[in-house]
Amino acid sequence: IIKSYSQAEFFTKLPEIEEEIKVVTYVAAEGDISTDLLSPGNQAHSRSDRELHGKCMISEDAQLEIRKLQKENPDKRVMIVSEKGTMGVGSSRMSGVNNVALWTGIQASPYVPFVNIAPIVAGTNGISPIFLTTVGVTGGIGVDLKNWTKKLDSNGDPIINNDDNPILEQRYSVDTGTILTINTKKQKLYDETGDKELVDMSSSFSPQKLEFMKAGGSYAIVFGKKLQSFACKALNIE
């Protein structure tokens, strides 16, 4: 075991991440989604109980709809979407990511109940940076959809409505139930068929983020390297 850790086999022996991930969308809200929607502050007392705290994510109706999407699309992952907004504003809130993973992620271990990893979240305006860091802790994927853009006039300036807000044009739909394809090799988001490119995702798949996804989260990398250093020291390997 020590020799294996000294050779970093805790990481090198892991399978590569899937080249193609099919997702089905669930629009949790229109506009920015606060982490308080995912893990309400008034339910903080239950955060140590993953199963119990998971029941407060968004709403009971939302949870039923997510389960329905999973039942109808057993070969696809549910992607939580902030339509016309940014996902995860407010705080990093690990419990919020844990809740999203609990409902839509992958089971971390068959021996540890209610601990899931690798959720997929998305926002028209991307993911809040501090929340995106927490998504990386679980080996998840954050998608900057860019599915709405500002409508421009002939001079290239945004067209403003009567409320002094820019008029938006939809580039493609992510309405609840929409099936999309994430290609991790090409680092792009495609339509259901995988033929039509919708948006570039290279920022979601930096070398470091790919490591986190392969390992099942950043903690696996951090503590794996600590164990590797210990193993090398024990075996007098530099």
Please tell me what each predicted stretch does.
Residues 1-238:
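Fe-S-dependent hydro-lyases/dehydratases of central metabolism
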